[in-house]
Amino acid sequence: MFNANLIKAITLDLDDTLWPVWPTIYKAEDLMREFLQPHAPKTVDFFANKESIASLRKKLIQDNPHFAIDLNTLRKTSIHEVLSMHQEPLELVDPAFEVFIQARQQVDLFADSFDALKRLSSKYKIVALSNGNANVFGMEIGQFFHDAVSAVQAGVAKPDAKIFNLAIDKTGFQAHEILHVGDDAHLDAKA
């Protein structure tokens, strides 16, 4: 039986729990394409075609299954592949990725997220637990987090118990003293 009085820490999903993820991703992709446009217009056209890029990413994940949890490497490899495919400058891979990942951290929190984190962090240790590549410590809300665990760190994605166990270890508490909050009933509740 659940006893809220036992809770000492909260593990917290990020994307679509604290902010809507897709507007952030779309804006980051737009900024990356703007950066690439003067130097790699064919690459920009390819990235603008959602079916083409989805097909490429699917193939990359089939060939490299770890890319399914390592979204940064997947994105860098995608950029490299598309630049190479169109014989455009490969030295754009790292700066294009940096434009994307910096914009990826510019999230628009849901209206109550900041105040809720502030209030909760005064009573509980909060650990970010995400399959994504957002870095809470690069955001204003980072001050409310004790630690963060990503799928890349754990070597597995939610709902695998290993990622939850790593987050439990980061809190220093036992599993029954931790509440997980997320937006996905399958990914955030199975373990």
Regions found by a protein language model. Name each.
Residues 127, 132-179, 185-187:
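Substrate-recognition "cap/lid" segment bordering the active-site pocket of phosphatases
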